[in-house]
Amino acid sequence: MLKAVVDGGTAGRLRHKYNMKGELAGKTGTTNNNSDAWFMGITPTLVNACWVGGDDRDIHFDSMSMGQGATMALPIFALYMQNVYKDSQLGYNENAIFDLPADYDPCSFVEEALEANDIEEIFE
């Protein structure tokens, strides 16, 4: 789900503007009154949180376009990760892939709930 944010959603500029390759996931965020801009960047081997804002709640960005996580916080993640990947001593690989356990079935709980005919169990 969070990979789609990068591949075709609000964090798409990681691919297009910053030319980032490999598997990435992320979540952009903006708080009320454009006070804070967030970006959570996830790679197979590293998780990053970027926040741009002020401790004083009276401080805020002038507009929604400037206060969005994709506008203010995402570029910090992109530039940081470009430098991480350039530094071979750190050992991070831009071509790493997300690893799932062999027996992982994201729909198993749905099938069990439907078999029990208890739709409420799905939403607990």
Which functions belong to the PLM regions below?
Residues 1-123:
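A penicillin-recognizing enzyme superfamily signal
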